[in-house]
């Protein structure tokens, strides 16, 4: 007889990882709101397209999130240059290159060819946040000899925090 009980330890790890990932997203949003107020950049979260398939009794909506090629964040920097960023978070000590969704590599490659800045914002459960150039992420195997990264691999891309704790993704925001 198969044991269908879920491992409570693994469940707790999953809950904690999800909460940390949501905090990472809130930190990113707060930084971009700050840059918008300063007139440094206008970078917005790309809405996830939701496809409604129907309603259950009681009005509950049934549907699914459609796969998308657009990155999580898109916007413009002061001076007119476009910027695109895909945000990824892991509760593990490494992040796989395959975490970028199908279709996104081609999308980001095209934007980069046209002169946009493109990055992957990588968050790790130990609190580290990194802004990795898309060209480095895309050629991870050539840079690191494997298709995943660890925090030790990407220290040069670490995003500092300001004295108030804000992620200084584009710099301190005092420019």
What are these regions (language model features)?
Residues 109-139:
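Nucleic-acid nuclease catalytic cores
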Residues 71-75, 79-92:
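Conserved catalytic cores of phosphodiester-cleaving nucleases, focusing on short active-site segments
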Residues 55-60, 86-94:
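Short, basic, glycine/proline-bearing loop/turn elements
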Residues 90-107, 114:
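Mg2+/Mn2+-dependent nuclease catalytic core
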Residues 133-154:
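Short, electropositive alpha-helical surface patch
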Residues 2-64:
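Acidic-basic catalytic patches of nuclease active cores, encompassing PD-(D/E)XK
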Residues 58, 66-70, 80:
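Active-site-proximal, substrate-binding regions of enzyme catalytic domains
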Residues 2-15, 152-175:
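Charged phosphate-binding loop/patch that engages nucleotide di/tri-phosphates or the phosphate backbone
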């Amino acid at each position: 007889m198969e044991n269908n009980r879920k491992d409570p330890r693994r469940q707790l790890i999953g809950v904690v990882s999800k909460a940390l990932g949501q905090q990472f997203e809130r930190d990113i949003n707060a930084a971009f709101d700050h840059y918008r107020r300063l007139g440094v950049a206008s970078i917005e979260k790309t809405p996830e397209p939701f496809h409604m398939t129907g309603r259950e009794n009681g009005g509950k909506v049934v549907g699914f999130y459609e796969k998308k090629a657009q990155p999580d964040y898109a916007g413009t920097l002061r001076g007119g240059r476009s910027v695109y960023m895909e945000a990824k978070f892991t509760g593990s000590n490494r992040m796989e290159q395959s975490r970028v969704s199908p279709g996104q590599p081609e999308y980001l490659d095209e934007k980069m060819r046209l002169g946009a800045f493109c990055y992957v914002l990588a968050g790790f459960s130990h609190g580290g946040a990194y802004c990795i150039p898309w060209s480095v992420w895309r050629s991870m195997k050539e840079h690191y000899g494997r298709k995943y990264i660890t925090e030790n691999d990407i220290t040069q891309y670490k995003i500092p925090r300001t004295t108030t704790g804000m992620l200084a993704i584009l710099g301190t925001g005092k420019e």
